[in-house]
């Protein structure tokens, strides 16, 4: 089996790798859109530059401002806009931190579209929803997609792109899988060829459960990332994780909707660089 670059880096790092979030401004056609694409892309590039200059290990672009979300497939203007945003991210990486990792998530659950964008823009991974098992989200019922998504990756010859999947994901109801533990779900994600899993709290900015992380990490040689609620105060508590995905804590006032705060990013990275897994 191919071990993708990002997977190798996560498993072999002496500390959790840090991935900063770029919450792309609301895109054309969505209710909150106010900016032209030129302004959206300028903001994406500016935030990417801030992240890479502060030494984060990777950056993820996500269309989080496109509320309310809709089920896949994503519409053409969303996919093309996210491709342009991803291109800005990759160009920033190449200019400031060539060794850094880049990823994408397209909401909601537009995993095939995210994979296509990652492939065409030269990114390293996608964050997927609904990879194994089903759940109920704000936008409705989300089906598991592992079989189709991995066949699509094979058809693109995009085996270099990793797929990290949320399990028991935030902003969702999981009563339909209440008899499946998060440990079992992680095992099934690995069995179905995910490259790693993401553990979150109940909502954006909410801390994950330490006990759930411990249970998931019993799956050997399988990256576990914490996908919400990480900050300078609790990073040490989750130090055994392979990666941190940080959005809210890197923003002014710790609010995900706000602009990036370079000082908060710098302070966090200095702290994380003292940690040892």
UniProtKB/Swiss-Prot annotation:
GO cellular component assignments: mitochondrion
Main location: mitochondrion
Entry keywords, A to Z: Mitochondrion, Transit peptide
This protein's record includes keyword Zinc: no
Record localization: Mitochondrion
InterPro entries tied to this protein: BtpA (IPR005137), RibuloseP-bd_barrel (IPR011060)
Keyword Amino-acid biosynthesis: no
Homology family: Belongs to the BtpA family.
PANTHER family per UniProt: SGC REGION PROTEIN SGCQ-RELATED, ZGC:162297
Name of the molecule in the record: Uncharacterized protein F13E9.13, mitochondrial
